[in-house]
Regions:
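Acidic, proline/glycine-enriched N-terminal capping motif
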Residues: 1-119
């Protein structure tokens, strides 16, 4: 499945959900909510789904560990996905957030419908 988006945010449909890649990292978590929300509104229109979801958020960085709280980043990104990927963030049954050293500064989000989740 091919990626959509030419700027900082790209996304693609995957089985049961969506995968999002955001290039670069800033220390301001609130920066990500409008960035991702507008991307879904303008470039990657999908209908939100019901049922339980599993979300994996990985922040990759190069060099020093960024001064960005993962919990604030997760909240901003989940708020941006609400109404696009899932109807409400209360549908998230499993959430994994991780910060790892990587090859470049980026954030990856994978949100998939839970296989044995409720409808």
């Amino acid at each position: 499945m091919t990626w959509t988006g030419k700027g900082k945010v790209r996304a693609r449909a995957i089985e049961g959900g969506v995968e999002i890649a955001i290039d670069g990292i800033t220390t301001q978590a609130r920066y990500y909510k409008p960035l991702v929300y507008e991307f879904f509104r303008k470039e990657f229109e999908i209908r939100p789904r019901y049922g339980e979801f599993e979300v994996e958020l990985i922040m990759e960085y190069v060099g020093e560990v960024p001064q960005l709280d993962l919990d604030n980043l997760a909240k901003a990104l989940l708020d941006a996905l609400k109404g696009h990927v899932f109807v409400d963030d209360s549908q998230i049954a499993r959430l994994l957030c991780e910060r790892v050293a990587g090859e470049r500064d980026r954030i990856s989000v994978r949100a998939v419908k839970r296989v044995n989740g409720s409808e």
